[in-house]
A protein has these predicted regions:
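Short acidic-aromatic low-complexity motifs
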Residues: 3-28
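Acidic, glycine-rich catalytic/binding loops that coordinate metals and/or anionic ligands
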Residues: 195, 222, 227-230, 252-313
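Exposed beta-sheet edge and beta->alpha loop/turn motif
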Residues: 57-106
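A structural signal for short beta-strand/turn segments enriched in small hydrophobics and glycine
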Residues: 174-176, 226-238
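Short solvent-exposed beta->alpha transition segments
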Residues: 19-59
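Zn2+-dependent peptidoglycan hydrolase active-site motif and core
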Residues: 163, 173-217
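Short histidine-centered loop motifs in beta-beta connectors
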Residues: 209-232
Length: 313
């Protein structure tokens, strides 16, 4: 088996080596990919890019993701390999930064305890899958990882995931203004698009800010609508309800409690923490610690089924 590393992959991309890249696609990825589309994509990407620098290497759940940004942060690349070193995802995109971002006025803590991995979070689409959507743009997704895996045993059972049933905490003092419960946890790998948030809670905080935590385990709420909460209070447990491919915590802060109309705010966290995809975050009850040097620097949410092309004039 040919050994592939990050430098080899990037060299082939920068050389427009379509044959080599397509040859290293998995069979499933070739079936949904076009050789001609790949040719055009590489040409367009190399037309706009500057010098690339590797940003992260992901090695988790038997998959590897490599992420690069160019020197001007105007374009980025993500390549994911399976355990056979076949390419199962390829993303080459221009990076569009939203310069007008409102920060929260008050400070929050993360709604978790102990060590969690930031699955999605940051200021571009390669780091944050929510970034295109103003009502989720600054959301964080958090998962648990042990020895390079998010689960043990059968990956189709929620209870085999390390995040499942862990406590969720109130991120700041506030009042519960909405609870949705009764939506069953889904089978990992399958999603519920009819109820994308799954079971969730919205908490009203000071200064007209509202936090929302989603994908909660059904019948695990420890509080009720109208209850006053204290920061760090146990409010529910982690589940896999809604549009969730595996048990995790979705956390965002908004300027309204209307999920369809609200805009997310960039969360000002305790200790000035600013975690992004791949960081390990630890909340001790007093401090938020961020480890940006963790080897398992991101999580592969799912195998991409298409070559992503978002180049526009």
């Amino acid at each position: 088996m040919e050994t592939i590393n990050a430098q080899i992959i990037m060299n082939r991309i920068e050389d427009n080596d379509v044959n080599w890249i397509y040859h290293h696609f998995s069979d499933d990825f070739q079936e949904v990919s076009s050789f001609d589309e790949l040719t055009k994509l590489l040409e367009e990407y190399n037309r706009i890019r500057t010098t690339n620098t590797q940003y992260k290497h992901i090695h988790i759940n038997h998959q590897d993701e490599y992420i690069w940004f160019d020197s001007k942060m105007t374009s980025g690349v993500s390549v994911t390999l399976n355990k056979y070193q076949e390419i199962i995802s390829l993303v080459l995109i221009p990076l569009r930064h939203i310069h007008v971002s409102k920060n929260t006025k008050q400070t929050y803590t993360l709604p978790i305890v102990q060590d969690w991995l930031v699955w999605s979070g940051g200021d571009n689409v390669l780091l944050n899958s929510h970034y295109h959507y103003k009502h989720q743009r600054h959301a964080l997704d958090l998962i648990c990882v042990e020895q390079g895996m998010t689960y043990k045993g059968n990956p189709q059972l929620c209870e085999n995931y390390y995040a499942y049933n862990k406590p969720i905490l109130a991120p700041a003092n506030g009042i519960v203004v909405e609870i949705v419960d009764g939506i069953a946890d889904g089978v990992p790998g399958e999603i519920n698009t009819n109820h994308p948030e799954g079971n969730y809670i919205i908490i009203k905080h000071n200064r007209h800010e509202y936090s929302m935590i989603a994908h909660i385990k059904p019948n695990s709420f420890k509080i009720e609508k109208g209850d006053e909460l204290l920061r760090g209070q146990h409010i529910a447990n982690v589940g896999n309800s809604g549009n969730s491919s595996e048990p995790h915590v979705h956390f965002q802060v908004m300027d309204s409690n209307d999920l369809q109309m609200a805009q997310t705010l960039k969360i000002k966290l305790h200790n000035y923490a600013s975690p992004v995809k791949g960081d390990i975050v630890t909340y001790t009850g007093d401090n938020i610690l961020v480890n940006k040097d963790n080897y398992f620097s991101a999580f592969i949410k799912s195998i991409s089924t298409n070559i992503t092309q978002i180049f526009r004039n």
